């Protein structure tokens, strides 16, 4: 959030979009959706060593309290409708993080029952590669999501998230 013009000791001016984006970036509440071994690394990221709370990132168990979903692990075709339902229950704006090679591209499982990347079903905002990715990689991906949120131009008064905005532009 940049300072456009100082008015004195106790005042600064900025755009409303910058203020709203700063608040959104500073309070990401991800819904954890651990499907395989990447979930272990996601739990390690949430431990005290990395301290996600200092970035305003607090894991939530309910989709109605979350604004981000982390898909971690292998997505099967049988699990895909459940993931879509959870995604639809999240309030706007909402973001999707694909964690691990399986969530990003299907990984080593090139079979009929595995979805070859969650981006075929949901609009992914951040991809975190690796098998499994280290906790530092997930932390870096969440910080990149914060950067992406800060660059959002139409957040105030808008009822759509970044992923849906990208879909409607295509």
Curated annotation (Swiss-Prot):
It catalyses: a quinone + NADH + 5 H(+)(in) = a quinol + NAD(+) + 4 H(+)(out). Pfam families: Oxidored_q6. It comes from the Bacteria. Its EC number is 7.1.1.-. One of its GO terms (biological process) is electron transport coupled proton transport. Its main location: membrane. Its cofactor is [4Fe-4S] cluster. Keywords: 4Fe-4S, Cell inner membrane, Cell membrane, Iron, Iron-sulfur, Membrane, Metal-binding, NAD, Quinone, Translocase, Transport, Ubiquinone. One of its GO terms (molecular function) is 4 iron, 4 sulfur cluster binding. InterPro entries: NADH_UbQ_OxRdtase-like_20kDa (IPR006137), NADH_UQ_OxRdtase_20Kd_su (IPR006138). It is found in: Cell inner membrane. Disulfide bonds: none annotated. The keyword Methyltransferase does not apply. The keyword Mitochondrion does not apply. GO terms for cellular component: plasma membrane; respiratory chain complex I. It is a peripheral membrane protein. PANTHER family: NADH DEHYDROGENASE, NADH DEHYDROGENASE [UBIQUINONE] IRON-SULFUR PROTEIN 7, MITOCHONDRIAL. NDH-1 is composed of 14 different subunits. Subunits NuoB, C, D, E, F, and G constitute the peripheral sector of the complex. Belongs to the complex I 20 kDa subunit family. This is NADH-quinone oxidoreductase subunit B. The lineage of its organism: Bacteria, Pseudomonadati, Thermodesulfobacteriota, Desulfuromonadia, Geobacterales. The gene is nuoB.
